[in-house]
Design a protein with these regions (language model features):
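Carbohydrate-interacting/catalytic domains
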Residues: 1-378
Length: 378
């Protein structure tokens, strides 16, 4: 009932922020406070320390990379709404016969799974429409409606992949408008791409160091932008993944991030954090502890920090930026770092930091969206 009534029906109809409509998700809950998240983490450690923490699976409607870019999109909600209105105004003829919710889904999907080609977007929109069972369905296919979805997908991907100096699509929009809406959509795609990567890396590091057992779906050592089955079952390029892990062994997080080698950034977070877990099993098992850490200052609401303890002593600290769009004054935002001597294992040139004091988050987050610290004085 849950799968067919909610996840495979209602979740394809409620599309204000499509990434909330995930398997096991609660679309009505837009966010959690950091305090609520900390309480949840403590509860998991106490009652389900071996629970699986999945990011992407064979059945997710959007991979973790797509969802992170959707969260970045939500950070610029007003600009996104204006861009969508402009796009609707300029594409009346193109979207004739397609309901507004599905058009909104197409725009969100193109923006958060970009780059995506017309065939993939068409397949996704058709599957989504059939699951929604409003205008077409698996048992009663409406060929005209699905053809309209294909035209929409083709026009949208052409616009987003075209030359910005040539009205994006190389020609006026379907009703002769000047393409301002398409330009606005593309601008937001460009603005939220890197913040989306940052949020994905932050989410990954949190998952790898939280109570529970983190699961890494096949091929997700690199950024993937897969959609619902069967898109998320495509065989990964294993040679490329092996080469990526080898590259990550020669780089650290800040270096890969500075050079926009974001796949290497993700591989660095995975390989180094898993190595830390192997060195510090007592900090992650059933007898480990979880301690929220206080963040203070001008952007305290934009970061999250916690410690994992072994034998009641903090030995691992995770610090992550949880909002990524716009400027951040990390120098004026501090963490109450526990006693001890600490080093960020995601950065090779990081100097040891003394705890027992408030330390500016700029120490780490000015260079990389996340830090995973290990205690040295043991």
């Amino acid at each position: 009932v849950m799968a067919k009534g909610a996840e495979d029906r209602a979740f394809y109809r409620y599309l204000r922020l499509a990434s909330l409509c995930e398997v096991g998700g609660a679309p009505g809950q837009w966010s959690l406070s950091t305090d609520a998240l900390h309480r949840h983490q403590v509860d998991v450690q106490q009652h389900a320390p071996l629970a699986m923490l999945a990011g992407t699976t064979h059945d997710t409607k959007r991979s973790e990379g797509v969802r992170a870019r959707s969260l970045a999109l939500a950070e610029v909600a007003d600009d996104w709404a204006a861009a969508v209105r402009s796009w609707f105004d300029g594409h009346g003829e193109l979207i004739e016969g397609v309901d507004a919710a599905t058009v909104l889904l197409a725009l969100q999907t193109a923006a958060t799974a970009w780059p995506i080609d017309a065939d993939r977007l068409t397949d996704y929109l058709v599957k989504s429409a059939r699951e929604a069972d409003l205008h077409t369905s698996w048992l009663d296919v409406d060929g005209a409606y699905e053809s309209a979805l294909a035209r929409l997908a083709t026009a949208l991907t052409d616009e987003l992949s075209g030359d910005p100096a040539d009205e994006l699509s190389g020609h006026p929009t379907a009703d002769g408008s000047d393409g301002d809406g398409a330009r606005a959509i593309r601008d937001i795609v460009d603005r939220t791409r890197r913040p989306g990567w940052a949020l994905s890396l932050a989410s990954l590091a949190i998952r790898l160091t939280s109570p529970g057992v983190a699961d890494l779906y096949q091929g997700t050592v690199a950024f993937t932008y897969s959609l619902v089955d069967p898109d998320n079952r495509i065989e990964p390029d294993w040679e490329q993944r092996r080469a990526l892990v080898e590259t990550a062994a020669r780089l650290d997080g800040p270096t890969s991030w500075e050079h926009d080698d974001v796949d290497a950034s993700k591989a660095v977070v995975i390989t180094r954090t898993l190595a830390l877990r192997q060195r510090r099993p007592a900090a992650f098992g059933g007898s480990a502890g979880y301690v929220p850490l206080e963040i203070s200052g001008i952007h305290a609401d934009r970061a999250l920090a916690f410690a994992r303890t072994a034998h009641d002593r903090p030995v691992v600290v995770t610090i992550a930026a949880i909002r990524a769009v716009g400027a951040h004054n990390w120098e004026a935002t501090t963490i109450a770092l526990p006693e001890g001597t600490w080093r960020d294992r995601l950065a090779d040139d990081e100097q040891a930091i003394a705890g027992g004091a408030d330390v500016p988050l700029a120490t780490w987050l000015d260079r990389f969206p996340v830090a995973v610290l290990e205690r040295l004085d043991e």
